[in-house]
Amino acid sequence: MNKVEMTYSELIGNTSISNKQKVVMFTSEIKALIKIGIVNSNLITTIAGFLLAISFTSSSFMSNWGTFLLTIIGTALVIAGGCIVNNWYDVDIDPKMSRTKNRPTVTGFFSLKSVLTFGLLTTAVGLLLLMFTSWYATLFAFIGWFGYVVLYTIWSKRRYTLNTVIGSLSGAMPPLIGWAAISPSFHIVPFVMFLIMFIWQTPHFLALAMKKRDEYEAAGIPMLPVVRGMAVTKRQIIVYIACLLPLPFFLLPTMGITFAVIATLLNLGWLAIAFTGLFVDEDKKWANTIFIFSLNYLIILFPLMIIVKLPIFS
């Protein structure tokens, strides 16, 4: 039986489905509800911030493994909580988009009341766990949650083309959370990590908006490609990627030449692909290339920050 055809209560009471199948189906719905992809990608930058703080403060990971677990689990729960509330709020527009129409809030697998309760409870537990690391980590997590749920989901998503930029605040917080769990003091490394994530998100999500332009238009969401067109969006993507160019050099004294060179090559490669958009007519195909590169960019850049701090590079 397809997941769309039943609610959570019906699944539990269905004797024709094995317990193993029920667990698989339930897990699938939970992953969709918490947006597991968003949670995982944000944890990459959280872990990077945490491990770099360990390195720069000459701390021991083994003596901080408990703090690490609290940081990762707490951050994951706060992010998941924000995504759950986002799903609850967007239940009226999600049916209009193919990538969101099968979310459990839309299909009715979970009741909206239970979704909201679960989202707020998950957030609260996450913040509580982070309090055992540091108040700064907790504050950064709350700012990220507030930015995503209130500033983006509720206030700007359905009103302004700048919704992407506004929402970028939340996605830039995880490296600060990871760092602050170990060290509350200001340092150039987490600040630049914040800037990288803040800037990176706009070309990433504008590329997605180009790919799904028709769906956003049908849902009434004023994404830049819908309101201003593809040409303007392409130019905006170029501008934001160009803004990434100077950032690796701010880390040259702390991260070394290897990181600066590789990060710059990534930036130049992404920028070169972006410029080709000015000369191609297949906008969605180009946007998909930009989108895929942005994912690889993140997967390469943040682990690279950790790798270059290994003794072999000292």
Curated annotation (Swiss-Prot):
GO terms for molecular function: protoheme IX farnesyltransferase activity. It comes from the Bacteria. It holds the Pfam family UbiA. It is found in: Cell membrane. It catalyses: heme b + (2E,6E)-farnesyl diphosphate + H2O = Fe(II)-heme o + diphosphate. Pathway: Porphyrin-containing compound metabolism; heme O biosynthesis; heme O from protoheme: step 1/1. GO terms for biological process: heme O biosynthetic process. Carbon 2 of the heme B porphyrin ring is defined according to the Fischer nomenclature. The chain crosses the membrane at residues 36-56, 65-85, 114-134, 135-155, 179-199, 237-257, 259-279, 290-310. Its EC number is 2.5.1.141. Gene3D superfamilies: UbiA prenyltransferase. This is Protoheme IX farnesyltransferase. Keywords: Cell membrane, Heme biosynthesis, Membrane, Transferase, Transmembrane, Transmembrane helix. GO terms for cellular component: plasma membrane.
